């Protein structure tokens, strides 16, 4: 349908809203006109002469933009005005359109809320098609060019129509039997017969009666029943397959059916349909032979993908989905019926010209833009302010994780002690020894679990700032030892384990009689301490003591992120010492407990960057009775519980020991011991650990509700009116915005907010086309191209700057595509990628085609580069490749994470250093760089070598694309590199013996390619090689790739297949190779084929040199061509590169 010469009714124009990705030119043309008309109502009321002057200006503006609008200009010049109140008529219609837009948001939000609770995953996209109020009839709007409409969820089929069958289809005011039919190419697909006398509605699909409604209008309600019981609604899909045959499906809350020929086949789910096709052939391009009347609700196109889980039966899923659609349709009908009827009657009472139709479309889009503005994120400056002075003991914010196992009885430490034996004759024997300690039941210990809330205020958020202190690994058996902290005779606090032997105040007796429990034979120490002490865990040389702060930004649009302009400071006060830290805030995304995506302001500061700590002492008990003895604990017996390892002490009379009186050695009696559990550390009194510590070591002591640094309490402090300045996008309406994939927000946001410091909202540039073009050109500068590549779903970014109307459509479909975390719900990610591409490709092509880029800039818009979060690994990826022709198989190597999609630059050893240690070191270093385990020196070395393109290895590029075709995954890998595969020939000839065949061979280094294509089998992870003809390679190229001379006699098909599979095997064996660069770039349709052609016509211009033009330079050029549309000028001609771009455009 050309525009606007063949526009015969509003119906033709408003079809544009049905499927935006397939109406690129028409939408952009209309959009561009909209940007040039500021006051449409005022124009409509002008005199004929004034209107002609305005129309002439509009035509000149369109011509200046260079848009392909010749037909529109001619129609505008011939525009005739009629004296009628068109403004009021079109205003009514505009209101109806705005209701449609708002209620589409309602549907999106309603769908989103219901999907959160599903165990399976249902992905539904809704496109509203606006019914015309100014047509001769009110028939269903099935498009003329349906064959060109892509079904974005199933590339084997194209949806012809999808409609809801229910009581809303019936005119209850009639007294005659009514037949309503959907007819395609003279075939009756659906027929509804309504019998007013009995209030029965029968529905038949391809001649078979499907169900019968018994309708009741009592109390203005409709009771719906079919033969199987309660029924909500019926959804019918008609799709045309690639072979031109029509398949028909029906979905109800009870079952899913597929109709084959003249009978139906029941299925329990949407998975595993019969592969048969019906007999309905489509022989005509015009399928608008429709005889039914649809009143009230607008036509809805619904696409559904559905992944079932065992925990959630399909009938419940479908019932929930269909009930929700039915409810949404009812809402639409109630809201819009009267508005449509009013507009319809007003339009039919007056005469409209084609120019009126054009004007009406402009008003329609203005209302859509108003809706976009109301729900589009606005770039906003905000300042978070600390309301009051905040000072608190640092321990109040401490949160720890107890990592001791419940059965822990590990040896925690040993102390140096001296053992004293005294007999009745005052003979004293002193010997050196060790006391060993078994861990108490630390798994049951209550550890710190605190946080502090700091009051803040801001323009858009009034949430509090949450402060938490983390000490990773502090309560972990692998990291800590057990020790005693006590005051020595000189009032210096130190660890008992560090006492000199002469200063030890722990004494052994002869072995006590513990014959009743041999399991604690090692725990037999006697302790006598004259001073207060503390028992705890010691963590030596800690690396981290993290202070985290977070504040949730409720008003922020989560898909766009933000950037922090300046941070504030906080301080630690330790007595008279003050240590200042920068908060280092950033904006990150997260998902709350309800499943809603949000943004929050976060800061993570390691306090040990300025606070020197040699050891952290975490008190687990203080002055527990009998554990540490003081003067008041004489003659106290404390023992052991044989069922739980713990430690205990036995007390002796201090005077007797000190005076060496003649006495009998005290032998502990047998008794029933009680378990000595560590006390709750949060309730301990820290007074006993404050004081003077032994010099030479910095100890941080955590005791109860206080933290001490070398005996002095540590406090956190943040001053009143401290400011944190930031920018982020807010969502005024609270409706869903574009959120199609999980993006790296922190990378995107800084660039988005720096596009234009004066850009405060999308609205500020909607009506200024030139400003939008200038900003886009600025964004496309080479220095910024890499950053722009990640900004693909920014409503306030390039998409809306270039095409505001597209942004409005994306608002509708984007919120549904990102219903929930796809990984969590097991969705097939390829379906989401296909849907996402449909509008990305539109943005790419439309902007290039209509000259919104500079004329001398050959790059396509790199919106097509999907960010890291959107390219997920496929559920079925090639881990094993079966080669049936040569009866072999290949198990993929260690780099399987990179074989689903994207571009790899793979390196392998060239043996330049022989087989010595240097060659081995290079291989090991490459492996570490690939795995992310390399140290700084190794990373820097490889980074330098890669930057200069002199890594002592061979590099080749793997362009990888995985498509899902029905239930089959097709994996295509195009290998490109110097002397790779079938490389380009030049003027060097080789003569075979007998001079029977002369073959050109490449005897110099040059670019080459090989395309390996495999498809999934019924075994997950197993792929097999396809027929070699599907690769697009010739027989000669396959033989060249294998290093074989092409035979004198043309080889058989099977022989070529064997050679093809042997090359796949060689290429697929990736052990001892390393992917040092990976680009998550998804190829546009036709891009790989266009790239192949570009290499073929350009490779002979590539002049190989060991330095400066080697395999690594070529790999870098290939990545630039594919991911950035960057032309390597030294070996690719400009005309060839333009043809590469044009080929992709034509394919799109």
Swiss-Prot record:
Residues 930-1148 form the PPPDE domain. Its main location: virion. It comes from the Viruses. It is found in: Virion; Host cytoplasm. PROSITE patterns: PPPDE. The keyword Nucleus does not apply. The active site is at residues 954, 1111. GO terms for molecular function: peptidase activity. The keyword Ribonucleoprotein does not apply. Keywords: Capsid protein, Host cytoplasm, Outer capsid protein, Virion. Pfam families: Peptidase_C97. One of its GO terms (cellular component) is viral outer capsid. Minor capsid protein present in the outer capsid, which is required for adsorption of the virus onto host insect cells. Belongs to the phytoreovirus minor outer capsid protein P2 family. This is Minor outer capsid protein P2. It comes from Rice gall dwarf virus.
């Amino acid at each position: 349908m050309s525009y606007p010469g063949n526009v015969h009714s509003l119906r033709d124009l408003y079809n544009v809203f049905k499927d935006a990705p397939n109406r690129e030119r028409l939408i952009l043309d209309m959009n561009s006109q909209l940007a040039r008309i500021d006051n449409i109502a005022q124009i409509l009321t002008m005199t004929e002469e004034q209107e002609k002057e305005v129309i002439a200006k509009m035509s000149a503006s369109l011509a200046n933009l260079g848009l392909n609008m010749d037909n529109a200009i001619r129609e505008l010049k011939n525009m005739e005005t009629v004296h009628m109140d068109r403004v009021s008529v079109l205003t009514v219609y505009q209101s109806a359109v705005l209701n449609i837009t708002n209620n589409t948001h309602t549907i999106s939000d309603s769908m989103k809320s219901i999907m959160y609770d599903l165990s399976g995953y249902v992905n539904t996209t809704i496109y509203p098609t606006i019914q015309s109020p100014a047509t001769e009839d009110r028939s269903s709007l099935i498009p003329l060019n349906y064959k060109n409409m892509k079904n974005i969820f199933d590339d084997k089929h194209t949806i012809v129509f999808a409609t809801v069958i229910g009581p809303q289809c019936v005119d209850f005011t009639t007294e005659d039997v009514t037949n309503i039919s959907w007819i395609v190419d003279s075939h009756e697909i659906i027929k509804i017969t309504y019998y007013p006398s009995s209030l029965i509605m029968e529905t038949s699909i391809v001649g078979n009666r499907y169900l019968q409604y018994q309708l009741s209008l009592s109390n203005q309600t409709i009771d719906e029943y079919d033969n199987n019981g309660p029924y909500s609604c019926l959804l019918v899909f008609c799709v045309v397959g690639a072979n031109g045959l029509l398949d028909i499906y029906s979905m109800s809350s009870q079952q899913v059916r597929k109709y084959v020929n003249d009978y139906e086949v029941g299925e329990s789910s949407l998975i595993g349909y019969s592969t048969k096709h019906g007999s309905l052939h489509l022989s005509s391009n015009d399928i608008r032979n429709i005889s039914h009347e649809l009143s009230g609700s607008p036509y809805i196109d619904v696409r559904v993908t559905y992944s079932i889980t065992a925990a959630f039966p399909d009938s419940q899923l479908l019932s929930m989905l269909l009930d929700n659609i039915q409810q949404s349709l009812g809402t639409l009908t109630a809201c819009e019926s009267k508005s449509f009827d009013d507009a319809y009657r007003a339009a039919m009472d007056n005469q409209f010209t084609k120019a009126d139709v054009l004007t009406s479309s402009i008003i329609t889009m203005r209302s859509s833009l108003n809706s976009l503005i109301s729900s589009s994120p606005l770039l906003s400056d905000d300042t978070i302010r600390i309301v009051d002075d905040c000072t608190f003991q640092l321990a109040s914010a401490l949160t720890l994780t107890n990592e001791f196992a419940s059965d822990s009885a590990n040896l925690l430490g040993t102390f140096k002690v001296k053992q004293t034996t005294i007999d009745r004759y005052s003979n004293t024997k002193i010997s050196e020894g060790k006391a060993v300690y078994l861990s108490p039941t630390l798994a049951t210990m209550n550890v710190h679990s605190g946080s502090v809330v700091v009051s803040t205020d801001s323009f858009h958020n009034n949430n509090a700032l949450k402060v938490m202190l983390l000490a990773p690994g502090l309560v972990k058996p692998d990291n800590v030892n057990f020790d005693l902290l006590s005051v020595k005779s000189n009032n210096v606090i130190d660890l008992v384990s560090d006492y000199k032997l002469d200063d030890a105040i722990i004494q052994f007796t002869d072995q006590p009689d513990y014959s009743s429990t041999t399991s604690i034979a090692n725990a037999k120490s006697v302790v006598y301490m004259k001073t207060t002490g503390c028992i705890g865990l010691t963590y030596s040389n800690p690396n981290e003591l993290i202070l985290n702060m977070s504040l949730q930004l409720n008003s922020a649009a989560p898909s766009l992120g933000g950037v922090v302009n300046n941070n504030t400071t906080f301080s630690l006060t330790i007595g008279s010492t003050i240590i200042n830290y920068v908060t280092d805030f950033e904006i990150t995304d997260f998902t709350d407990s309800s499943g809603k995506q949000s943004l929050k302001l976060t800061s993570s500061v390691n306090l040990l960057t300025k606070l020197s700590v040699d050891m952290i002492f975490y008190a687990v008990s203080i002055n527990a009775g009998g554990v540490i003895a003081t003067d008041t604990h004489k003659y106290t017996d404390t023992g052991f519980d044989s069922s739980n390892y713990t430690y205990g002490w036995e007390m002796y009379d201090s005077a007797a020991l000190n005076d060496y009186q003649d006495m009998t050695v005290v032998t502990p009696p047998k008794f029933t011991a009680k378990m000595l559990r560590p006390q709750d550390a949060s309730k301990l009194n820290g007074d006993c650990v404050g004081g003077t510590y032994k010099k030479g070591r910095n100890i941080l002591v955590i005791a109860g509700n206080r933290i001490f640094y070398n005996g002095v309490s540590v406090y956190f402090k943040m001053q009143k009116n401290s400011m944190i300045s930031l920018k982020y996008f807010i969502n005024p309406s609270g409706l869903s915005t574009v959120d199609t994939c999980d993006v790296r927000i922190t990378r995107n946001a800084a660039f988005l907010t720096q596009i234009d410091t004066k850009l405060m909202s999308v609205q500020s540039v909607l009506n200024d086309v030139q400003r939008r073009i200038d900003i886009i050109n600025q964004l496309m500068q080479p220095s910024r191209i890499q950053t722009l590549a990640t900004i693909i779903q920014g409503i306030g970014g390039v998409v809306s700057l270039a095409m505001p109307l597209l942004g409005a459509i994306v608002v509708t479909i984007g919120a549904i595509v990102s219903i929930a975390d796809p990984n969590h719900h097991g969705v097939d990610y390829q379906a989401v990628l296909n849907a996402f591409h449909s509008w990305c490709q539109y943005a790419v092509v439309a902007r290039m085609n209509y000259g919104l880029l500079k004329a001398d800039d050959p790059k396509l818009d790199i919106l097509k580069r999907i960010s890291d979060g959107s390219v997920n690994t496929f559920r079925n990826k090639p881990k094993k490749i079966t080669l049936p022709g040569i009866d072999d198989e290949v198990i993929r190597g260690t780099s399987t994470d990179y074989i689903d999609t994207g571009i790899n630059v793979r390196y392998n050893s060239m043996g330049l250093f022989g087989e010595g240690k240097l060659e081995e070191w290079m291989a090991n270093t490459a492996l570490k760089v690939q795995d992310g385990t390399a140290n700084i020196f190794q990373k820097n070395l490889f980074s330098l070598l890669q930057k200069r393109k002199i890594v002592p290895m061979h590099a080749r590029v793997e362009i990888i694309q995985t498509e899902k075709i029905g239930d089959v995954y097709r994996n295509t890998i195009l290998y490109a590199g110097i002397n790779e595969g079938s490389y380009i020939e030049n003027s060097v000839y080789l003569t075979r013996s007998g001079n029977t065949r002369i073959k050109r061979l490449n005897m110099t280094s040059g670019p080459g390619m090989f395309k390996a294509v495999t498809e999934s089998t019924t075994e997950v992870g197993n792929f097999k090689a396809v027929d070699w003809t599907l690769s697009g390679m010739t027989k000669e190229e396959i033989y060249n790739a294998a290093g074989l001379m092409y035979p004198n006699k043309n080889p058989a098909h099977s022989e070529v297949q064997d050679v093809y599979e042997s090359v796949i095997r060689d290429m697929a064996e990736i052990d001892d190779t390393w992917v040092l660069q990976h680009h998550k770039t998804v190829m546009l349709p036709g891009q790989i084929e266009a790239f192949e052609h570009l290499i073929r016509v350009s490779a002979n211009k590539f002049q190989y040199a060991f330095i400066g033009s080697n395999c690594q330079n070529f790999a870098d050029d290939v990545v630039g061509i594919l991911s950035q549309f960057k032309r390597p000028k030294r070996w690719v001609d400009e005309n060839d590169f333009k043809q590469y771009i044009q080929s992709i455009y034509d394919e799109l």
